[in-house]
């Protein structure tokens, strides 16, 4: 059984921590989509001695994807699925670079998957972490500095998906978004190991507190107050202004 992570990055400061963390819990391969980062993400990984055999980088190179990066059937059919098959990947976890799978009592990904099988899509709830009132994070990581989270799990989920079940047929409800991937009439489960009706629903309500569930996705949504303002607020303002005055294509 072989597992992989797919992640989109653009000037992610702490991609090395991300790779090392997921390698530690048993992820064997990474597909990284570099969305025109200022510094080539491959150069960052090489400088930090990350084994080049465990990842492949896809570059947007200014390409405009039909319906955007998340909804590009062409990207999945021509680049992502072939890479997954070439590397004999059985299960794919699609997350953002600030999201870390908390595996709880499971020793590694194999143990986790063995517990939940059979499934085609495992919907894992997100737990949001805050800023810890840190103005600027000068460390190389987010896991240690930011230890204050919400008390309740978010209803939103990310999915661990069986590669052979991924459906890229738009006529059958292809939904290549960062939350769920559509599967071929498959079995979808929640983190309580219960079968759920919808394979494409973006939310699953879990009533238990976060420390009473087997697994969750830790989302470090505010890596410090300065970065949050720059990336979440200023970037949106710039986009709105540039679109209004046609400053960008």
Positions of predicted regions on the chain:
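Catalytic-site signature of metal-activated, phosphate-bearing donor transferases
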Residues: 69-74, 103-249
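Short acidic/polar active-site loop segments enriched in Thr and Asp
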Residues: 28-29, 90, 120
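Short beta-strand/loop segment that forms part of the nucleotide-sugar
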Residues: 28-36, 56-60
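Active-site-proximal specificity loops/subdomain of glycosyltransferases
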Residues: 42-94
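A generic secondary-structure signal
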Residues: 21, 78-83, 112-115
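Structural recognition of the beta-strand scaffold that forms the well-ordered cores
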Residues: 4-7, 31-32, 54, 123
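The conserved acidic donor/metal-binding loop of glycosyltransferases
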Residues: 96-100
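N-proximal low-complexity "stem/linker" segments adjacent to membrane-targeting elements
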Residues: 1-23
């Amino acid at each position: 059984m072989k597992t992989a992570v797919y992640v989109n990055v653009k000037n992610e400061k702490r991609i090395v921590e991300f790779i090392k963390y997921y390698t530690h819990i048993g992820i064997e391969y990474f597909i990284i989509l570099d969305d025109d980062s200022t510094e080539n993400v491959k150069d960052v990984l090489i400088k930090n001695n990350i084994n080049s055999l465990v990842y492949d980088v896809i570059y947007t190179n200014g390409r405009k994807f039909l319906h955007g990066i998340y909804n590009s059937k062409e990207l999945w059919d021509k680049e992502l699925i072939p890479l997954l098959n070439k590397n004999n990947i059985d299960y794919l976890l699609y997350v953002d670079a600030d999201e870390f799978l908390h595996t709880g009592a499971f020793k590694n990904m194999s143990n986790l998957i063995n517990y939940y099988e059979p499934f085609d899509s495992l919907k894992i709830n997100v737990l949001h972490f805050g800023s810890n009132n840190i103005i600027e994070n000068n460390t190389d990581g987010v896991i240690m500095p930011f230890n204050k989270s919400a008390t309740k799990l978010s209803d939103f989920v990310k999915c661990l998906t069986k590669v052979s079940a991924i459906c890229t047929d738009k006529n059958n409800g292809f939904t290549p978004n960062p939350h769920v991937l559509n599967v071929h009439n498959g079995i979808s489960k929640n983190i309580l190991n219960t079968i759920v009706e919808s394979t494409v629903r973006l939310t699953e309500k879990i009533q238990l507190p976060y420390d009473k569930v087997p697994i969750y996705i830790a989302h470090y949504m505010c890596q410090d107050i300065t970065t949050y303002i720059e990336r979440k607020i200023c970037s949106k303002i710039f986009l709105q202004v540039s679109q209004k005055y046609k400053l960008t294509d």
